[in-house]
Amino acid sequence: MAIIYLILLFTAVRGDQICIGYHANNSTEKVDTNLERNVTVTHAKDILEKTHNGKLCKLNGIPPLELGDCSIAGWLLGNPECDRLLSVPEWSYIMEKENPRDGLCYPGSFNDYEELKHLLSSVKHFEKVKILPKDRWTQHTTTGGSRACAVSGNPSFFRNMVWLTKEGSDYPVAKGSYNNTSGEQMLIIWGVHHPIDETEQRTLYQNVGTYVSVGTSTLNKRSTPEIATRPKVNGQGGRMEFSWTLLDMWDTINFESTGNLIAPEYGFKISKRGSSGIMKTEGTLENCETKCQTPLGAINTTLPFHNVHPLTIGECPKYVKSEKLVLATGLRNVPQIESRGLFGAIAGFIEGGWQGMVDGWYGYHHSNDQGSGYAADKESTQKAFDGITNKVNSVIEKMNTQFEAVGKEFGNLERRLENLNKRMEDGFLDVWTYNAELLVLMENERTLDFHDSNVKNLYDKVRMQLRDNVKELGNGCFEFYHKCDDECMNSVKNGTYDYPKYEEESKLNRNEIKGVKLSSMGVYQILAIYATVAGSLSLAIMMAGISFWMCSNGSLQCRICI
């Protein structure tokens, strides 16, 4: 009877409640932190772009220079198969095949070719300027050509160069100069012919022991032809060696030769500089536009990182080798479990989130005689939202020193340098990737701790208002010692709770409940003593009965000695 009375009493005195909690939803988004892996959160943002469209596009409305079957050398020298490239508009980047067919039609080499390609990564337009017209070489033949560069079966030559040979039986010293008054630097290319034997040397130049001299304010280069027997390429045993230089504004370049000079007819004024590059690709230009191009395809994204390809041109995210970079923006997603009550362990004592609270990250659940309901705490939610909104920008700012993997090419004699360069670039990218991943892990840890702290702060804010007018239930909830209607609940939520107004009522109810607890302790003590005595007596009677039965059937002998 006493137990029933206590149950009814405690049911009757259960007061109104208000609980502090946080948002939960059906999200399956997972993030990693320094300490945990695959933490489910309510909201997250993937900051790694993994896709491309597989197309080569215009970059910011400007098409690339599509070389087709021509190489960089074939374009600049003027291979007859590259006539469509004799005049090209501004380009955004250059598309070159891996092994273009039309390069040096007359076999030979191009000195510092890789450096020339690197120069093109900062050039967006050349203006072709005639610097040494053919008709200025009045004492030499300027119609030299070769079947290696044939057009329609007839011998021809590089369109931008002039092959000077003897006029009749004489090859006087050839001299030419050009003063760069264009207002920009100018790319100038020239060449030296290396015959197969002395007979060819005399046939073309009359002189033996010739030289080619080129000079500027910063360049002094003198070359002599190397006569040697070589295997034929494109039907030619001779070779042509091309060189280049950048002629500064107001500087002059001077040519002097007694034979074997391949003179430039045109130079290339660098009329526009900017971020460009050479895309090694077998693809063709498609009808599309982008702000970021890779050899694999265009990237159209606002994300700060990508893992598509290390070589990019345009306004591109930063390249990392990572497979996953996800930033937590929401809270740990721990939906409410009915059997465990309303809460779970986000702030150390709250056991689960509320899917019913959809208009904020943190808030309240109340219950009183007028009903129950959820309400978000707009102030703390807004502050948290403002703090996290700039998280992606913060990550970008911390990673603002982009390591740029530039596509470099190396000659056959520089393979060891190429391997070293590749290792260095791979090392830089590894470090860059590690930094990005570590930064994301740290930011995720901070975000989850930040949310945890905000819930705890909201709980403390309510606790400081209510003080001893409530009882802390230990699960994020407070039970009032006084009646708290909806107006009272709203005052708690907006921070205007009137503690003195309810102080006296709370004090009376608190003392009454304490009295019930004290009286109930006496009842429990009597019940405990009664249960102990009754249990001992029952055990003694049972033992006596067993002993009597065993004595009666002879299983137990009893001797009484006097």
From Swiss-Prot:
Residues 1-15 form the signal peptide. GO terms for biological process: clathrin-dependent endocytosis of virus by host cell; fusion of virus membrane with host endosome membrane; fusion of virus membrane with host plasma membrane; viral budding from plasma membrane; virion attachment to host cell. Palmitoylated. The record marks R340, G341 as: Cleavage. The chain crosses the membrane at residues 526-546. Keywords: Clathrin- and caveolin-independent endocytosis of virus by host, Clathrin-mediated endocytosis of virus by host, Disulfide bond, Fusion of virus membrane with host endosomal membrane, Fusion of virus membrane with host membrane, Glycoprotein, Hemagglutinin, Host cell membrane, Host membrane, Host-virus interaction, Lipoprotein, Membrane, Palmitate, Signal, Transmembrane, Transmembrane helix, Viral attachment to host cell, Viral envelope protein, Viral penetration into host cytoplasm, Virion, Virus endocytosis by host, Virus entry into host cell. Coiled coil: none annotated. Binds to sialic acid-containing receptors on the cell surface, bringing about the attachment of the virus particle to the cell. This attachment induces virion internalization of about two third of the virus particles through clathrin-dependent endocytosis and about one third through a clathrin- and caveolin-independent pathway. Plays a major role in the determination of host range restriction and virulence. Class I viral fusion protein. Major glycoprotein, comprises over 80% of the envelope proteins present in virus particle. The extent of infection into host organism is determined by HA. Influenza viruses bud from the apical surface of polarized epithelial cells (e.g. bronchial epithelial cells) into lumen of lungs and are therefore usually pneumotropic. The reason is that HA is cleaved by tryptase clara which is restricted to lungs. However, HAs of H5 and H7 pantropic avian viruses subtypes can be cleaved by furin and subtilisin-type enzymes, allowing the virus to grow in other organs than lungs. This is Hemagglutinin. It comes from Influenza A virus (strain A/Japan/305/1957 H2N2). The lineage of its organism: Viruses, Riboviria, Orthornavirae, Negarnaviricota, Polyploviricotina. The gene is HA.
